[in-house]
């Protein structure tokens, strides 16, 4: 498994360099307490064969709580997929020639560091990008020395290690490598280069990269990737200290149908019609980096479970035996009932018909929490019900009362049927818009003209039947008063990502699509029009990688009959102890505004506009009612924007 004379010139073999890197990872990327827990988790479960301690696929799946083929009661079967990924990553930075690796403690140290992105303390020049490593761990890349058969002695030694190791080699058939005209970018190997530079072993990398250059010309099988996607969707809300079975123990038929639907929607983004033999690296890199930046975040919290051992109780005396502690702990864990998973949705005036758990997981793969660079489920944010056509009716008056009084970011979701007149075939579609800035009432001059920072950009997206994400435009030139992120008018309805015409007394003009994506909802909240273009950088939203890669320059237009329209407010977790001033909470501010409006309405009842009032009193009363929006229609007061 070594690299011959070329490595001997450097004075170190790949095995020795891999050992040194694992030691540096262990000492610099974990705290002493984390490393103690890690060692206890590993060595208390490891198989010992001829002095080599390692984990099999069964041990890995059982510890993480990941269903595999032995769990007949669970429809998920992601254990073998995770095992092949871990076996590949365990050979880092020589995964081209040494993968699949035996899961020794050193290999598992590298796996946890890579999947939890802790390598920055050692690999300072490395770009925080795991896309290429993750692709290699899922694709069939011929990992034993450019197609040469494995050593017979090695087969004899590993014969009894794991019956599932054979499934790792043959159970995930991926089509033969194909040339995708992909131009290799040296920057994509930053992780490997940084690792070997830290070990003064660049010559080893040059040899290793020549051995198997087809590693990134291979493809990921759709079946393998679907199994991983379904697991990621199920465990997306998982925290570092939660048991995985909390999310996998109650996968009934309805829940699994929803999970499969979300997984198929994500798979559709990779344009499988043009590459039926699997997912190429170019497609994988473009979609994951540009459209699903948080897709693999659940693996971070999953593998952080290795850094907490239930066997260790630091309050106990050192005289206690380890076996007794393990047995007692295992018995307590098995007897303790699993609590229900917490929901990101807060109770309120309605329950969502769109936001099922699998849809929320899908959202967390590309939406970040406001002002933080973590996904929606990791940023301590909650969704408060603000408006729903099911609960509040299809009325712009009700929309205005509930949405324009909400002083925080919102998430707008729409579900409906695509009509026959659309460019795409008929079927159900789910769209949405992420709007970090709150809606504002008043003339267009009140809409923000300054550019948004990178963490407060809006986005327009499609959840199903095909994942589509149009990110917010960072260019200062597109943030104009007549092109707000979202606009509301009692005359024309709701416009997202559109150009708003100037007000006119004689003629009513409709908002027009602008840039790469727009959504227009009519004043009755019964129909909508969705525009998606592969070109156009002059609007609020940029082209989606899923649309751009199709090669067409035509703008697709979809007419939609709306079933349900929902608006959810973004608020911090109310249970957060750092929230000491409830007046800054959007929920409290909205209630205070409603109370004020109720008091003003009560006060207006005493006004008599017909009898006993002079001209000045009449004008004052009329001004009050116009200000409240109850009568009159002053120019510029019929709309609101963001």
From Swiss-Prot:
Q: Which UniProt keywords apply?
A: Cytoplasm
Subcellular location, principal = cytoplasm
Q: Does the keyword Hydrolase apply?
A: no
InterPro entries, per this entry? TLDc_dom
Disordered: annotated segments: 143-186
Subcellular location(s) per record: Cytoplasm
Domain named TLDc is located at 353-571
> Which domain of life does the protein's organism represent?
Eukaryota
Biased segments, Acidic residues type: 177-186
Compositionally biased tracts (Basic and acidic residues): 154-163
> Would you name any one GO CC term?
cytoplasm
Q: Which family does it belong to?
A: Belongs to the RTC5 family.
What biological function has been recorded for the protein in this entry? May be involved in a process influencing telomere capping.
Q: What is this protein called?
A: Restriction of telomere capping protein 5
Lineage, opening ranks: Eukaryota, Fungi, Dikarya, Ascomycota, Pezizomycotina
């Amino acid at each position: 498994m070594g690299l011959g004379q070329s490595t001997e010139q450097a004075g170190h073999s790949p095995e020795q360099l891999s050992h040194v890197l694992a030691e540096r990872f262990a000492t610099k990327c974990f705290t002493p307490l984390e490393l103690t827990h890690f060692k206890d988790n590993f060595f208390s479960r490891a198989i010992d064969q001829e002095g080599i301690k390692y984990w099999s696929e069964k041990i890995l799946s059982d510890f993480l709580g990941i269903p595999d083929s032995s769990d007949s009661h669970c429809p998920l079967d992601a254990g073998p997929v995770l095992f092949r990924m871990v076996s590949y990553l365990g050979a880092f930075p020589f995964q081209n020639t040494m993968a699949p690796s035996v899961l020794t403690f050193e290999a598992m140290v590298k796996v946890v560091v890579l999947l939890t992105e802790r390598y920055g303390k050692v690999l300072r020049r490395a770009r925080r990008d795991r896309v290429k490593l993750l692709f290699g761990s899922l694709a069939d890349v011929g990992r034993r020395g450019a197609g040469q058969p494995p050593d017979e002695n090695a087969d004899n030694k590993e014969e009894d290690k794991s019956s599932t190791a054979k499934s790792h080699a043959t159970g995930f058939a991926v089509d033969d490598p194909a040339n995708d005209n992909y131009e290799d970018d040296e920057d994509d190997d930053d992780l490997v280069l940084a690792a070997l530079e830290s070990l003064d072993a660049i010559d080893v990398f040059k040899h290793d990269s020549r051995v198997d250059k087809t590693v990134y010309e291979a493809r990921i099988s759709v079946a393998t990737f679907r199994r991983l996607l379904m697991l990621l969707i199920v465990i997306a809300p998982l925290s570092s200290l939660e048991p995985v079975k909390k999310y996998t123990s109650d996968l009934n038929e309805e829940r699994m149908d929803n999970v499969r639907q979300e997984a198929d929607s994500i798979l559709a983004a990779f344009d499988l019609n043009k590459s039926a033999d699997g997912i190429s690296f170019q497609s994988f890199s473009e979609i994951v980096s540009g459209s699903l930046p948080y897709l693999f975040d659940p693996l971070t919290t999953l593998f952080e479970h290795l850094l907490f051992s239930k066997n260790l109780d630091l309050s106990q005396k050192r005289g206690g035996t380890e076996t007794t502690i393990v047995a007692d702990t295992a018995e307590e864990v098995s007897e303790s009932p699993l609590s229900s998973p917490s929901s990101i949705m807060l109770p309120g005036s309605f329950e969502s018909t769109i936001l099922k758990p699998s849809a929320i997981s899908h959202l967390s793969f590309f939406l970040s929490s406001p002002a933080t660079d973590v996904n929606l489920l990791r940023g301590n944010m909650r969704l408060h019900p603000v408006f729903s056509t099911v609960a509040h009716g299809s009325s712009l008056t009700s929309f205005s009362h509930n949405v324009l009084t909400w002083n925080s970011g919102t998430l707008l979701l729409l579900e409906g049927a695509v009509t026959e007149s659309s460019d795409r075939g008929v079927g159900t579609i789910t769209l949405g818009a992420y709007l970090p800035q709150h809606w504002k009432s008043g003339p267009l001059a009140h809409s923000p003209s300054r550019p948004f920072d990178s963490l407060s950009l809006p986005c327009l997206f499609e959840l199903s039947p095909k994942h589509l994400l149009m990110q917010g435009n960072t260019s200062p030139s597109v943030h104009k008063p007549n092109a707000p992120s979202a606009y509301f008018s009692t005359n024309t309805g709701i416009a997202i990502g559109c150009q708003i015409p100037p007000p006119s007394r004689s003629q009513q003009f409709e908002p027009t699509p602008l840039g790469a994506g727009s959504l227009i909802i009519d004043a009755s909240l019964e129909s909508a029009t969705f525009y998606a273009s592969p070109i156009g950088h002059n609007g609020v939203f940029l082209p989606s990688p899923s649309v751009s890669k199709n090669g067409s320059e035509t703008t697709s237009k979809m007419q939609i009959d709306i079933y349900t329209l929902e608006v959810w407010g973004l608020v911090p977790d109310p249970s957060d102890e750092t929230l000491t001033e409830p007046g800054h909470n959007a929920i409290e501010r909205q209630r205070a505004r409603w109370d004020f409006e109720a008091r003003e309405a009560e006060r207006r009842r005493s006004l008599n506009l017909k009898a006993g009032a002079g001209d000045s009193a009449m004008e004052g009363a009329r001004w009050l009612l116009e200000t409240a929006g109850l009568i009159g229609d002053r120019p510029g007061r019929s709309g609101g924007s963001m």
